[in-house]
From Swiss-Prot:
Homooligomers. Forms double-helical filaments necessary for the formation of replication compartments within the host nucleus. Interacts with the origin-binding protein. Interacts with the helicase primase complex; this interaction stimulates primer synthesis activity of the helicase-primase complex. Interacts with the DNA polymerase. Interacts with the alkaline exonuclease; this interaction increases its nuclease processivity. Plays several crucial roles in viral infection. Participates in the opening of the viral DNA origin to initiate replication by interacting with the origin-binding protein. May disrupt loops, hairpins and other secondary structures present on ssDNA to reduce and eliminate pausing of viral DNA polymerase at specific sites during elongation. Promotes viral DNA recombination by performing strand-transfer, characterized by the ability to transfer a DNA strand from a linear duplex to a complementary single-stranded DNA circle. Can also catalyze the renaturation of complementary single strands. It comes from Elephantid herpesvirus 1 (isolate Asian elephant/Berlin/Kiba/1998) (EIHV-1). This is Major DNA-binding protein. GO terms for molecular function: single-stranded DNA binding. It is found in: Host nucleus. Keywords: DNA replication, DNA-binding, Host nucleus. Belongs to the herpesviridae major DNA-binding protein family. InterPro entries: DBP_sf, Viral_ssDBP_head, Viral_ssDNA-bd. It comes from the Viruses. The keyword Protein transport does not apply. Gene3D superfamilies: Viral ssDNA binding protein, head domain. Residues 1140-1143 are annotated as: Required for nuclear localization.
Length: 1143
């Protein structure tokens, strides 16, 4: 715990918990905000990020000690933290923030209708008699023209309920001049009502007419706070009475009732409609449900309304994509950044286990006994979060198990619809509008059964039959979107089960994502300082020093630069052999040293088997200030985490005190205080969540504030004539002097499988591999022209002929025969040797990766790990690609209607402009990616387990999980009968590196999609080594039969990102386009691309190249390496794919 006077909490100054900002409008700032805000068509409130020099002044204090109430002439200060967003009230010119907004249709009606069907109804009747304050009133009060200024509110987490209720009092006389960037502005404090009145009977229901008459109440602001903050919280908690939830959180903040149960009286449960659960199971599930609610509500605001550092990303003009850029460049960079984000938002929507849907607490049945209870371990295994989409189709029961809410009838063969998408947005029209914007810029995945979204657009725009927009905006409306993305939405009919949770968050600096993670890292080992037999124990194992020696060698030999990028140059076959031989010798020498060092440590092998990759995700709310939509995701994730962690103490309590009362609320009120007090201890230093604790000194001080009693007597709203403000020196007391803030949580992955017999990690028999598909393929393809300067065919074609020993049929000059034979023999030897100890199911793509893979493979082989793959973590990096506008109609003019589909495509061909779309591409260096501070979309499972023998504590661990769904991303792969289970040994993380984007770089040392099926066929073609003709023509024929006009990025994906093949294919496609060829059979392609070097039998000069004595056979590999090569997959038709295609 930090208790010095210089910690964030102690050094926080006194300040108000909410402000009204009035700042000048300029075209530049409007252009910027238009790209960053959340809007809704029928709301005059816009949600914008809290950023320095954009919405707040530089140096704006995020953590302040707010004057909350006046008691016995003493001011009570409470530490508060500002929300990372502001709320712009823009009723006079609401179109200012809609330049970049898609017209998505009647989203508010859709959201409210869905919310009502799910049971979340809004009630604003309590505000009927309130006096409204508009942005025009604010501008008038401070005497500025409303057309030149806009008005917005910044508020702390603790004050948000007071702002919602309209209880905060504007101090119009305390008008402060500020400067935001080069714009002039003002700000006015919003004062707590309890500086002027008292709350009674521990219930905050203010009746003081001064508060009701003068409190800052804006109906659109109240509704926006309801839909963006409070109802999403209620949805995450499965708590239908949102109004009661708001009153509870307000009462808790003012009256400090955190340790008492507040929600149980009005909770509605759905577990009683589950016929698979016994009565005892239902009671246990109901108690877990409500207690998770109570714990989360009690801790959520105190955690958020605490002390936090201001991250560097709050300074907008220091972002690398903004700094020193022209205004046009800034806007272009922001637009591209949003397209990168579209991949993450799409993943959240298309994943069936997304945090946006995963709000339901479920239980495995048949494990509880109503009288005897259940063990803690059993409860922890049986209680889990799952998707709550189907809560729409479940009955609701009250505290006494009486039916209070009838379910909505569930149709047969139900498909994902607008109600479900609204549920993902927690029924917020602001959030849903932005989600639709991102999905409109995502790719459509077509299947053989998918409905044509183009037909939907053509028919509904011409006839006006679209129910979402009446046919006026079918290029962007939510109705057309539901049709276009139908194949990518999750399947909601699948069985509900325990699954990982997918979320999108920022990583922190610490990450260890090397292949063996924590093994041999100094931070993970402690030196035993005890002496044994007169000798000092060995130094901690340090794998890094041996790897650094290899890197030093590479730098001396100019193979890599200081940043690890490849710099080697190869100009001949001999030089290639010399470089690789020297590098391999260095790797093996350092490996021998490491193995020798490992012998000194008795537990080194166990440490190797338990090696752990890990990274941390940021829980500072201000890290997400740049995106209000990510703030929404952050809050959903935080609630999910707190509920999951609460299950630990809940399970212990239920196990000790089984339910015996007739009403759940009686049991909850009896036991909640102990649950509340034990929760903090149960999560502190338990392996998952990291908190920062602060202790504040000087709990009693003196400070000068407005004379609040005088202000109430002489309250004025007219500020045209400035007058002096009466002030008083008050004695101030802190509400509490211990606070805890959220720092991060950790996600781990163990790459070495525990189950040695698991089929998912067994190595299949691939036979003798072609070197072009081996560990050095990245070099022989990169330096193909340097190694074979007189060869005009592609690397794949040449090595296929070498492999099949058919070069003697072609006139080709490979160079000196002895050099060629030596080089080819060397390549096959390296390929066979590498594969003999290979445990990594990925090919290296750089020198650094080759070093790491070879080092790890040989280390594992020497340690007894043989015949098995290990798990790997694949970073899928977002990238932007050019695409055709046909698939992204959001870029077209909405007023244009089309009579036929052909007319639509003809119009698209005439479209002028570049259209980009966000996609993903596998990134070879996962650890290097995490050094670039990426925004990640990651699936994780929160596991709970007991400690070692003698330790009764329950620990938590975040385990890297999987994505659930078939339409998430085509790089996630496909499960099929002929798969070798590589999808089971690969974990994927979507990454967008933010270094050089938002962060400045710090120098230091069962849909089956057409593309998926095609990629599998091409992979099989590349894996089958049979000769007879150019393998590239077979690949080209297969691609052109299925893909119309593929672009370079399509070819990269289909060929597994083998650039040399994609480039060669792309060149051939250009030739075909110029010749206007329509037949893509292998025979037709052979006529267009004849073997230029093929001669007749009498003229063949390549007959001297016979490599049959060089290329090893499978029996040779068995004899040399001792590998047990077995048939892994049985394919009914053993005819090679190339031959089947020709037949």
């Amino acid at each position: 715990m930090s208790s010095d006077d210089n910690n964030i909490a102690s050094s926080a100054s006194s300040g108000h918990g909410a402000w009204i900002y009035i700042t000048e409008k300029t075209p530049d700032v409007l252009d910027i905000l238009n790209r960053l805000v959340l809007t809704s068509a029928d709301s005059d409130v816009t949600i914008a990020p809290l950023l320095y020099d954009v919405t707040v002044e530089p140096g704006f204090e995020l953590t302040v000690k707010c004057p909350l109430m006046l008691t016995d002439n003493n001011v009570i200060l409470k530490l508060s933290n500002f929300m990372p967003c502001v709320f712009i009230i823009n009723s006079t010119s609401s179109e200012d923030f809609r330049f970049c907004e898609d017209v998505v249709g009647n989203v508010s009606e859709i959201c409210e209708g869905a919310a009502s069907r799910y049971g979340y109804t809004a009630d604003f009747t309590e505000f009927n008699e309130r006096t409204e304050t508009t942005d025009s009133d604010v501008c008038s009060n401070v005497n500025v023209p409303e057309s030149d200024y806009f008005v917005y509110i910044a508020c702390t987490y603790g004050y948000k309920e007071l702002l919602f209720k309209g209880y905060l009092i504007p101090h119009w006389q305390d008008l402060r001049d500020i400067s935001i960037g080069n714009r002039r502005g003002y700000k006015i404090p919003l004062l707590s009502p309890f500086l002027f009145t008292q709350c009674k009977d521990d219930t905050v229901q203010l009746t003081d007419q001064f508060i009701l008459d003068n409190g800052f109440y804006n109906p659109d602001l109240t509704k926006t706070l309801y839909s963006y903050i409070f109802r999403p919280l209620a949805v995450s908690l499965r708590y239908l009475d949102v109004t009661h939830l708001i009153s509870v959180t307000l009462n808790q903040y003012i009256t400090d009732t955190h340790a008492t149960a507040k929600l149980c009286d009005k909770k509605v449960y759905t577990c009683h409609g589950n016929n698979k659960l016994s009565t005892g199971d239902r009671d246990v599930l109901a108690l877990c449900d409500i207690l998770a609610n109570e714990v989360t509500v009690s801790y959520l605001t105190p955690f958020l309304d605490s002390a936090y550092d201001a991250p560097s990303t709050l300074d907008f003009y220091s972002w690398p994509i903004v700094k020193d850029k022209t205004h046009a460049e800034i806007l272009e960079n922001l637009d591209q950044f949003l397209l990168h984000m579209s991949v993450h938002i799409g993943t959240l929507i298309f994943s069936g286990n997304s945090v946006l849907y995963q709000n339901k607490i479920s239980k495995v049945g048949g494990q509880s006994d109503g009288s005897n209870g259940q063990s803690v371990e059993g409860l922890l295994k049986s209680i889990y979060h799952t998707t709550g989409i189907q809560l729409l189709y479940e009955d609701g029961y009250d505290d006494t198990r009486s039916l209070v809410r009838q379910h909505t009838a569930k149709p047969k063969n139900l498909k994902f619809n607008m109600d479900h998408l609204s549920f993902g947005a927690s029924f917020s029209s602001h959030v849903l509008t932005k989600i639709v914007w991102f999905l409109n810029r995502s790719e459509e995945y077509k299947t053989t059964q998918s409905v044509s979204s183009t037909c939907y657009l053509v028919i509904n725009s011409s006839t006006g039959t679209c129910t979402a927009c009446d046919g006026k905006h079918c290029n962007t409306c939510i109705g057309a979107l539901m049709c276009r993305m139908a194949t990518r939405f999750p399947n909601i009919n699948r069985q509900q089960k325990k699954e990982p949770c997918v979320t999108t968050l920022l990583t922190r600096m610490f990450a260890d994502m090397t292949i063996l993670g924590s093994f041999g890292k100094k931070y993970n080992t402690e030196r035993d300082t005890q002496q044994k037999d007169g000798r000092v124990s060995a130094e901690p194992l340090d794998k890094a020093k041996y790897v650094l020696n290899i890197l030093d060698y590479c730098k001396r030999e100019c193979l890599i630069d200081s940043d690890g990028n490849d710099t080697l140059k190869i100009s001949s076959k001999q030089e290639f052999i010399k470089i690789i031989t020297g590098l391999n010798r260095t790797i093996d020498d350092e490996l021998i040293k490491l193995l020798s060092d490992m012998r000194k440590h008795s537990n080194a092998k166990d440490d190797l088997n338990n090696s752990t990759m890990s990274f941390t995700l940021d829980l500072n709310p201000h890290a997400y200030a740049f995106s209000p939509l990510l703030q929404f995701v952050y809050m959903k994730t935080l609630v999910n985490i707190l509920e999951s962690l609460a299950i630990v103490v809940i399970a212990e309590k239920i196990s000790s005190y089984p339910m015996t009362q007739s009403a759940y609320s009686r049991w909850v009120k009896q036991h909640f205080q102990s649950v509340y007090s034990e929760f903090k201890k149960s999560i502190y230093k338990k392996g998952f969540l990291t908190l920062s604790d602060y202790k504040m000194k000087n709990t009693t001080t003196n400070d000068t504030f407005t004379d609040f009693s005088h202000l109430k007597r002489d309250y004025k709203i007219d500020n045209t004539v400035r007058s002096s403000i009466a002030t008083v020196n008050y004695q101030c007391r802190l509400w509490n002097f211990h606070v805890s803030s959220l720092r991060d949580f950790r996600i781990k992955y163990k790459p070495i499988p525990k189950n040695k017999d698991s089929p998912y990690f067994q190595k299949a028999d691939k036979g003798i591999q072609n070197p072009v598909c081996g560990p050095l393929s990245f070099l022989i393809t990169r330096f193909h022209k340097d190694i074979f300067p007189n060869v005009n065919v592609s690397p794949m074609t040449l090595w296929q002929r070498i492999y099949s020993n058919t070069l003697k049929n072609f006139n080709v000059d490979l160079g000196d025969k002895h050099d060629v034979e030596t080089f080819i023999k060397f390549m096959f030897e390296q390929t066979v040797e590498y594969e003999g100890s290979n445990s990594i199911d990925v090919r290296p793509e750089t020198i650094l990766q080759y070093i790491e893979f070879r080092f790890v493979n040989r280390l594992l082989h020497a340690s007894g790990h043989r015949g098995q793959y290990i798990g790997i973590v694949q970073a899928l990096c977002t990238t932007l690609s050019d695409t055709k506008v046909d698939g992204l109609p959001c870029y077209l003019d909405s007023s244009r209607t089309f009579g036929t589909v052909s007319e639509y495509h003809a119009y698209c061909r005439e479209y002028n402009g570049t259209v980009k779309v966000g996609r993903t591409r596998p990134y070879c260096n996962t650890n290097g990616m995490f050094e670039r501070r990426p925004l990640v979309t990651v699936p994780y499972a929160l596991e709970k387990y007991t400690g070692a023998a003698g330790n009764a504590s329950i620990f938590q661990c975040g385990q890297l999980g999987y994505f659930s769904g078939t339409g998430i991303d085509r790089n996630l792969g496909m499960i099929n009968r002929t798969s070798d289970y590589n999808f089971m040994r690969r974990k994927h993380i979507f990454c967008t590196p933010l270094t050089d984007v938002l962060f400045t770089k710090i120098s230091r040392g069962a849909h089956v999609f057409d593309f998926d099926m095609l990629k599998q066929r091409i992979k099989q073609l590349l894996d089958e080594h049979c000769g007879g003709f150019d393998i590239e023509l077979a690949i080209l024929s297969e691609i052109l039969k299925h893909v119309k006009e593929p672009n370079y990025n399509d070819l990269l994906f289909i060929t597994g990102y083998q650039e040399h093949i994609a480039s060669s294919l792309f060149d051939k496609i250009k030739v075909l386009d110029e010749l206007e060829i329509s037949s893509y059979s292998i025979e037709s392609l052979q006529e267009i691309f004849p073997e230029k070097e093929e001669l007749n039998d009498t003229e063949a000069t390549g007959s001297g190249y016979d490599f049959s004595f060089i290329i090893p056979k499978a029996t040779d590999v068995d004899e040399i390496t001792g590998l047990n090569i077995q048939e892994f997959t049985n394919i009914e038709d053993e005819t090679p794919l190339v031959k089947r295609m020709r037949l």
